[in-house]
């Protein structure tokens, strides 16, 4: 068993205009998780985001939605991690993933940023890529020139349902992550 997850980061952009966009699926997951765990987000200026502390049987878990916009997400992650002495390998970052079929989920430790600016900034601020990622598939628009508009728009009703299903499945696996059961959660999340 590895170190359990102590911080869950949902990536997204602040503001009503971004709420239901593909790029905000990390926020979708954290909002649903907070509701299920009866946690309340509070605006924490020193952590550059909305933060909730959840007491779990295996210890406290911090939920954070950076309010810095995607490209500066690492500022919030690093501030909270440093303050509470949370190691990179105890952090889970939940984000949208263009290169995964809509509705599919991938879980991994480390790796590149795949062009995702939120991940790029987190890696730079933590000084390592060795944190966990929960990658929620949103599909690719097919042409690189369309990516920015695609991620900043709302998905179709069909895709929204697939994404919501992947969010709900992911949430069922999170207690395994906070218990440090990474192999088991990987089997669960990667199954159809």
Predicted segments, located by residue:
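Hydrophobic alpha-helical segments within soluble ligand-binding/sensing domains
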Residues: 115-118
């Amino acid at each position: 068993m590895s170190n359990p997850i102590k911080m869950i980061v949902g990536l997204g952009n602040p503001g009503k205009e971004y709420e239901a966009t593909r790029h905000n699926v990390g926020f979708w997951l954290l909002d649903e998780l907070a509701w299920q765990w009866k946690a309340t987000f509070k605006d924490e200026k020193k952590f550059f985001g909305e933060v909730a502390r959840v007491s779990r049987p295996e210890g406290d878990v911090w939920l954070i939605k950076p309010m810095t916009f995607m490209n500066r997400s690492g500022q919030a992650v690093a501030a909270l991690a440093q303050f509470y002495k949370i190691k990179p390998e105890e952090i889970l970052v939940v984000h949208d993933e263009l290169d995964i079929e809509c509705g599919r989920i991938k879980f991994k430790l480390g790796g590149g940023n795949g062009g995702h600016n939120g991940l790029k900034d987190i890696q730079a601020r933590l000084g390592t890529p060795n944190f966990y990622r929960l990658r929620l598939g949103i599909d690719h628009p097919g042409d690189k020139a369309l990516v920015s508009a695609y991620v900043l728009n709302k998905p179709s009703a069909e895709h929204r349902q697939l994404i919501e299903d992947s969010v709900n499945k992911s949430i069922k696996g999170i207690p395994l992550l906070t218990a440090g059961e990474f192999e088991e959660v990987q089997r669960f999340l990667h199954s159809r």
